[in-house]
Each structure stands twice: as structure tokens, then as C-alpha cells.
A protein has these predicted regions:
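Conserved SAM-binding loop of SAM-dependent methyltransferases across substrates and taxa
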Residues: 244-257
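S-adenosyl-L-methionine
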Residues: 269-307
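Non-catalytic substrate-recognition/targeting regions of SAM-dependent transferases
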Residues: 119-126, 130-132, 148-218, 226
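Mobile active-site "lid"/loop adjacent to the S-adenosyl-L-methionine
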Residues: 306-336
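Conserved class I S-adenosyl-L-methionine
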Residues: 234-243
């Protein structure tokens, strides 16, 4: 049986944990035994000796402990099976289209959703673990030493609960290096088919689980893509930072007359072009390699106009120290996008930077609107989908902001 260390918090440092946050920083602990190895289990007590929870410890990390349980649960195979089964049950209950298509449905009826997040780390009680499902394949990200130590238990639990044909480890996040782990990606169970295609909101989307961004595509935006259904019909649309084109392809599916997508990645643009052809949308979708900042500036100079502009950039704010610099970048692209919109046109604008909260992002959008002297109406304010749940006591779990605005 695995030995479990005991650690104590400094006086007054328990409030965040009692409010539901699962992290403990090194400056909040009185110390830890010298025998501690990265990934060991530890029971956490407050300064008076009251038990608070059980987690794994890594003295090499700024986040020294991540709680797995608020009781003295055994962190064994049954623990992981239970947590993953609970997470899957949550998705089946809360995500609209995970239900199987009924036998009496027409054969051209939409297929049930096959791509979704099964485990969203801390929000599902499994800090440091991401599990995404793509049809019969599963992609995992193990981000911490504590979860890396339990990799085999995790894989066994996934086989028990999800029974995938293949499991791909996408352990290429820089977060692993901060935990003292190397980066790697490989097929760790089963055999991955040479081509994997899943239905996304009625589109057939080919996934590259080994080389694609994140674990294959941006699952946190799948629900938000549907927001275009009310604003894309008949539009001339510009999809910026388009990656493999899913925003633009959804716009075309929902009736956009013409879509132009821009991304600086050649493989992404090749993928977007292929998806447009596969879905019969190539006649209305054009994707090109380009720098979005330069493209927006040049199109503004030429006084081009669009009915719909989509901004879904990568995270500009990697650390709090870079926030002000990143805010300038966010403001520039949103300001130029507003200038490109015809009266009553729509702007879909997103940020996946945790350090840029929703209130600050909204104020930034207001500043941009004021600078271009345009009145702007908020149509929808959204976040990540329900398969990416948010812990109320953990602000870090709420990272995606998505606004649909109408520029009057």
C-alpha cells in the first residue's frame, strides 16, 4: 500500500480550500517531509491539525499539492473508475446531443455528438488530467507528476469505462516541464485508424489526434459554433485565426454567402481547405495563409466591408506579467474588426486567456467600440461548453470568453 505523507498549512491559509479550490502553493505550507518524491500522496491539515483533504504533492512545482479528495479515499483503480464514470455520466446528462439517434429517426438526421471532453481536470475531481473522446478513440493529456505516476491506473480505468479502440497520449504541454516531466505524444493503447472523422454540428470533421492543436480540435467551442446559425445567413464573412476553419465552415453551413479564412499555419490552411471540399462548401469558402494583424490592417486600408467577422485567436496572455501587452493586441484586432463591419454587421470575438477575465474583456471591447465611434449591441455572452465544466470556487477553470456583438 502506498505511504501517505502528512503536511500542514500555515495559519489562515485554508480559506481558499474550504471554498472549493483544489490547489495549495508552496508558500502556504509549513513544509513537507524530506522524503517526499514528486507525485507522492499527502494528507493536508490546517494549522490546528484538522483534516482538509488528500492529494498528490510535487515539491518541484509552484502548485505543491493538488487535492484529489476531501476525504481519505484510496487513490486506486476503483477511485479512477468512479471519477471517470461520474464524468461521463455528467456529459450524458448535460450535453444536448450525446444521446444516440433513435432507430425510427431518418437516416439523414444529425448523428449524435461523437467528440467531447470526458474529463476536465480539476472540474471533474482529477487535477492534471484531460480526457477527450473522438468517436472510438480517446486522447489524454497528463499534465502533472501526480497523474503521471498513476498513468497505468488511468489507462485501465478508461478501458473499463469508455472501452476505446485507441488511446493517444498528447503529453506535449509546456506545463509538463514545470512539473519535471518530458513532453511526448504517442499511441499508448490500441491502434489508431489512419483517418478519423467525427460529426460536429452536422459537419464531417477529420481529426489529427497525434499532430493537431490541443487534443485534435477546439472542443470547448463546439457549442459556440452554433451561435452563428442566427447571424451568418447571407453574410460575407471573415474568419480570423481560422486554424482548420471550423468557425468559417459553420458560417457557410448556416448560410453565409462567402467565407474568407486566414491563419499563419500552412498545415492548418491545407486542413481547412480539405474540410471545405469534404463538406461541399468549397464554392463559398476560401482559406489563405496570412498574418491576421497585417491582413486586418490592409483590409481596413482598402476599406473592405463584411457582414460577419470572427476573431478566435490563440491565447495572447500566457502570464499575468504580459497582460498589458496582450490587452493592446486584443484591442487592436477588435477595433479593426469593428471598422470592417457594415452597419448591423456581427462580430464574434473570443479569448481563451484565463488572465483576461470576462469583465476586463468586455471593457476592452467597449473601449474599441468607443475608439471607432460605433454603437455596439451585445447579442450573446458565452463561455466554454458544458463538457468543460467550471468550478465556482476555482476561477482558473473559467477561461473561455465568447461574445457575439452587433455593430450598429
Amino acid at each position: 500500500m502506498e505511504s501517505i505523507h502528512t503536511v500542514r498549512l500555515k495559519p489562515g491559509e485554508e480559506d481558499r480550500l474550504l471554498a472549493g479550490h483544489p490547489w495549495i502553493y508552496r508558500n502556504e505550507l509549513q513544509g513537507w517531509p524530506p522524503s517526499v518524491e514528486p507525485g507522492d500522496l499527502a494528507d493536508v491539515h490546517d494549522s490546528r491539525g484538522h483534516f482538509l483533504g488528500r492529494g498528490y504533492i510535487n515539491p518541484r512545482s509552484a502548485i505543491v499539492i493538488r487535492l484529489l479528495a476531501r476525504d481519505r479515499a484510496s487513490i486506486d483503480l476503483d477511485f479512477f473508475i468512479h471519477r471517470i464514470r461520474e464524468a461521463q455520466a455528467w456529459r450524458e446528462r448535460m450535453v444536448d446531443d450525446l444521446r444516440t439517434r433513435p432507430p425510427q429517426a431518418r437516416q439523414d438526421a444529425p448523428l449524435p455528438r461523437a467528440a467531447y471532453r470526458v474529463v476536465h481536470a480539476e472540474a471533474d475531481g482529477l487535477p492534471g488530467l484531460i480526457v477527450d473522446r473522438y468517436g472510438e478513440a480517446v486522447a489524454i493529456q497528463i499534465l502533472t507528476a501526480g497523474m503521471e505516476r498513476r498513468r497505468e491506473l488511468i489507462l485501465q480505468a478508461l478501458e473499463e469505462v469508455l472501452r476505446p479502440q485507441a488511446v493517444v497520449a498528447r503529453n506535449d504541454s509546456p506545463m509538463r516541464e514545470r512539473e519535471g516531466l518530458s513532453r511526448e505524444h504517442s499511441v499508448v493503447r490500441g491502434e489508431l485508424p489512419p483517418s478519423l472523422t467525427v460529426p460536429i454540428n452536422g459537419l464531417a470533421v477529420t481529426i489529427d489526434l497525434l499532430e493537431g492543436q490541443k487534443t485534435g480540435l477546439f472542443l470547448d467551442q463546439v457549442d459556440n459554433y452554433r451561435l452563428l446559425e442566427r447571424v451568418a445567413d447571407g453574410a460575407e464573412a471573415l474568419d480570423c485565426f481560422c486554424y482548420t476553419g471550423l468557425w468559417g465552415l459553420h458560417a457557410a453551413r448556416y448560410g453565409a454567402a462567402r467565407v474568407t479564412g486566414i491563419d499563419q499555419s500552412v498545415p492548418a490552411i491545407e486542413g481547412a481547405t480539405a474540410l471545405a471540399k469534404r463538406n461541399g462548401l468549397a464554392d463559398r469558402c476560401t482559406f489563405r495563409v496570412g498574418n491576421v494583424f497585417d491582413e486586418l490592417k490592409e483590409r481596413d486600408r482598402r476599406r473592405e466591408a463584411f457582414d460577419l467577422v470572427i476573431l478566435d485567436p490563440p491565447a495572447f496572455v500566457k502570464t499575468r506579467a504580459r497582460l498589458q501587452e496582450a490587452l493592446a493586441g486584443y484591442k487592436e484586432i477588435n477595433l479593426r474588426a469593428m471598422r470592417l463591419l457594415r452597419p448591423k454587421g456581427f462580430l464574434v470575438t473570443c479569448s481563451c486567456s484565463y488572465h483576461l477575465n470576462a469583465e476586463t474583456f468586455r471593457r476592452l471591447l467597449w473601449d474599441a467600440a468607443r475608439d471607432v465611434r460605433r454603437a455596439v449591441r451585445v447579442v450573446v455572452q458565452s463561455a466554454q461548453g458544458r463538457d468543460h465544466p467550471i468550478l465556482l470556487g476555482m476561477p482558473e477553470s473559467e477561461y473561455l470568453k465568447c461574445f457575439v456583438l452587433q455593430v450598429l
